[in-house]
Amino acid sequence: MFKRIAIAQIRTYTNGVVFKTASKPKRRWIPWTIFGGSFLGGWYLTQHMTFTDLLAYWRYDALPKNADEVVKYHADLNRRLNGLPIVKQLENAGFVQVIANEEENLLVSRALNTPGGVAIPPRVYYNPSRRETVGLYHLGMKLTGYPFLIHGGILATVIEDLMKEAIRLEKGTKNINQETKNLSISYKFPTLANQFVVVRTTDLQQYGNKTKLKAELMDQSGNRTLVKANATFSSEQGNPKEEK
């Protein structure tokens, strides 16, 4: 009798519920991740990409520079550049536009000079009283490392390019050979592709044939610093006969 009662009690406590395998919780974060990624991608495309920009990324680089599509794309970028508030701010602050020495950095003026890269020449402004130089560069989608973000090496190249231009303007000659002794880069925020960036050099100091200076790369509004840098260059006068 007691045996039957004990067996009944055991069956009561072992009715199968205890041994039931718990179902795996649904991964609700996956749909939200997909939604969030799609939303951010869509926002970026609407804010920073036009149909012309997409064409420049996919097919304009295969066309000659005098093709109608490429010429119109360059004209559109220059119109966008002229409409930036930073342009008027620089002019009001006493900066004057100067002609950049395109032969100084062939990587920027030649290799990267393509639709989707640095499609138009950078616009350079100089203020002799403040000894500051500002460059406006358009960085396209072909210069990305991670999706929609400009590669850090490209940013360093652009900063170094303007630093050399600043030294050339300070010395008053483009016939000068410059060597980068050291370049220190500090990345503060990611830089979105397909927008203009503002590069400004400051604190230029000369010690014989060496020049030290600082620079910062900002977004196209000029309000957010994305990269900071400082560098030392050595300079030697070139052949006077090559001076133009």
UniProtKB/Swiss-Prot annotation:
It comes from Saccharomyces cerevisiae (strain ATCC 204508 / S288c). Belongs to the FMP10 family. It is found in: Mitochondrion membrane. Present with 1920 molecules/cell in log phase SD medium. This is Uncharacterized mitochondrial membrane protein FMP10. It comes from the Eukaryota. It is a multi-pass membrane protein. The chain crosses the membrane at residues 29-49, 139-159. GO terms for cellular component: mitochondrial membrane; mitochondrion. Keywords: Membrane, Mitochondrion, Transmembrane, Transmembrane helix. PANTHER family: UPF0644 PROTEIN PB2B4.06. The gene is FMP10.
